[in-house]
């Protein structure tokens, strides 16, 4: 049965965004949303007809050209010119899933009736989404104020038969798409180009994608860390509730409880130990993983607000009879949190790599580099090198993009957020963290075999059994990179162990 999501003023959660994108929902406008869009457009048309006062971006030029008035017969051409001139993207393409989130968020933002778009324009964006049309958008070009002008220009050019798209497995021009689908080119009305291009949907889409993936990785990090702790013959006392009750950060409490749940019933963890404590990368898992959880919760809260907002300019307020040029396009509210999340995810990878290092170090009864005959075999030596390389790259990406600002548009736009750069850096670091965690899993599962016949917990034994269906125990040196790739794929496709995680 076809799954339908109705675009309305009801709250749109990140969980719902993930459901729509990854479970192939179709979109449709609620009747209330249709009425709001039509009402706002009607008000704007009437405002233009009766007012002699210039309205920024509606009857004037853009940016530093805001004082140049545009005659009424040029208003439609002004919108086309805006879209063409602002399509200056460079670099790699924005991934398909993120482009689809951009489309969804742009439709949602326009549906509130504060932007002045025509109903037919919003409906065509919905047509794109429902048909699986993916406009080709580029990673570089947005300074994060006035919104995401460059990527949103590429997103919306196909409305008028320009730009390029991917559709049904091939790349084609916007004109070819319209011909193929028998769609008319949209005749943009006044202000529409600005409504389409102004907004934070590119930044917000990267943030949504990152939160959705990072929450999964945060759960995986706990599972893998628990496996590493047991394979390293670590101690459980550092996870006792009494320890964390006296420093009750929520993420810390949740992580300690979850590690304890994951290791419940382990023969290895219950054995008496000769060592009195573990290295920080094991002992401080609750404090580090927990802080990442708290960061995720904060950033999700910010993005939750952003994706339920109208972020273009000027803001059209029919009830107040106002068209106000302001700054809701500025990306600062999400640029800073995305930089924060980049740092948090880099730290999650950082501590993971440290555990991998300990596993291959030939201590706690484990052989050097986790291979039975070290010397003739190098074993897992270089997996740690790879993790170290990736972690180092992520650390280099932790310089906050939002710390920089370069004036644009002849100084009229003299402070920008660089939030799009924060988003693309975050995208890289989240993917890097997934790879580092996959490498830790590869090492931890290998190390566990040297504890046999003792067993870890039933939950983790099931996890390892599933993992062994795709990645074997390594007895002698083999080409390793396919197993790293399979480990990454395992994290992407395998269901997390059922321990009722809180985040």
Task: Write out the residue ranges for each language-model feature.
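Conserved, non-catalytic sequence blocks in retroelement Pol enzymes and Pol-derived host proteins
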Residues: 114, 143-145, 375
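N-terminal flexible segment immediately upstream of the FAD-binding catalytic core
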Residues: 1-53, 58, 62-64, 69-90, ...
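FAD-binding glycine-rich core of flavoenzymes that anchor FAD
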Residues: 114-140
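C-terminal auxiliary extensions adjacent to catalytic cores
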Residues: 2-25, 29-36, 40-43, 48, ...
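FAD-binding core of FAD-dependent oxidoreductases
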Residues: 56-70, 74-78, 85-110, 138-160, ...
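Alpha/propeptide regions of enzymes that mature by internal proteolysis
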Residues: 93, 113-118, 219
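Cysteine-centered functional microenvironments
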Residues: 137-142, 319, 323
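Generic short alpha-helical segment signal, independent of protein family or function
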Residues: 67-70, 83-91, 103, 107-110, ...
């Amino acid at each position: 049965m076809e799954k339908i999501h109705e675009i309305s003023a009801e709250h749109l959660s990140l969980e719902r965004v993930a459901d729509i994108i990854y479970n192939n929902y179709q979109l449709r406008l609620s009747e209330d949303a249709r009425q709001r869009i039509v009402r706002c457009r009607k008000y704007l048309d009437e405002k233009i007809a009766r007012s002699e006062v210039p309205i920024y971006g509606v009857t004037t030029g853009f940016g530093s050209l805001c004082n140049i008035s545009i005659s009424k017969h040029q208003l439609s051409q002004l919108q086309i010119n805006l879209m063409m001139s602002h399509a200056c993207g460079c670099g790699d393409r924005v991934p398909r899933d993120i482009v689809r989130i951009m489309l969804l968020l742009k439709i949602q933002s326009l549906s509130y009736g504060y932007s002045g778009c025509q109903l037919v324009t919003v409906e065509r964006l919905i047509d794109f989404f429902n048909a699986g049309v993916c406009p080709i958008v580029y990673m570089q070009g947005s300074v994060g104020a006035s919104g995401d002008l460059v990527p949103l220009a590429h997103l919306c050019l196909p409305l008028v038969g320009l730009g390029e798209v991917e559709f049904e497995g091939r790349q084609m021009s916007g004109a070819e798409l319209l011909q193929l689908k028998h769609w008319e080119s949209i005749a943009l009305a006044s202000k529409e180009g600005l409504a389409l291009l102004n907004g934070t949907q590119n930044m917000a889409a990267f943030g949504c994608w990152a939160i959705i993936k990072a929450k999964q990785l945060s759960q995986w990090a706990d599972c893998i860390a628990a496996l590493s702790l047991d394979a390293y013959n670590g101690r459980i006392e550092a996870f006792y509730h009494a320890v964390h009750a006296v420093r009750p950060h929520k993420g810390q409490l949740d992580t300690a409880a979850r590690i304890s749940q994951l290791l419940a019933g382990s023969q290895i963890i219950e054995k008496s130990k000769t060592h009195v404590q573990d290295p920080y990368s094991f002992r401080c898992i609750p404090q580090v993983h927990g802080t990442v959880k708290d960061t995720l919760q904060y950033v999700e809260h910010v993005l939750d607000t952003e994706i339920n907002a109208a972020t273009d300019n000027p803001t059209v307020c029919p009830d107040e009879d106002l068209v106000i040029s302001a700054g809701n396009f500025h990306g600062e509210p999400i640029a800073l949190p995305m930089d924060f999340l980049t740092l948090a995810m880099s730290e999650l990878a950082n501590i993971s790599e440290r555990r991998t290092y300990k596993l291959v170090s030939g201590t706690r009864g484990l052989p050097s580099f986790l291979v039975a005959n070290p010397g003739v075999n190098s074993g897992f030596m270089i997996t740690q090198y790879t993790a170290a390389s990736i972690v180092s790259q992520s650390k280099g990406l932790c310089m906050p993009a939002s710390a920089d600002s370069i004036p644009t548009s002849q100084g009229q736009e003299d402070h920008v957020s660089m939030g799009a750069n924060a988003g693309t850096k975050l995208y890289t670091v989240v993917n890097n963290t997934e790879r580092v965690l996959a490498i830790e899993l590869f090492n931890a599962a290998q190390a566990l075999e040297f504890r046999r016949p003792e067993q870890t917990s039933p939950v983790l034994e099931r996890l390892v059994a599933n993992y062994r269906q795709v990645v074997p125990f390594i007895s002698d040196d083999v080409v390793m990179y396919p197993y790293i790739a399979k480990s990454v794929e395992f994290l992407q496709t395998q269901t997390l162990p059922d321990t009722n995680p809180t985040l």
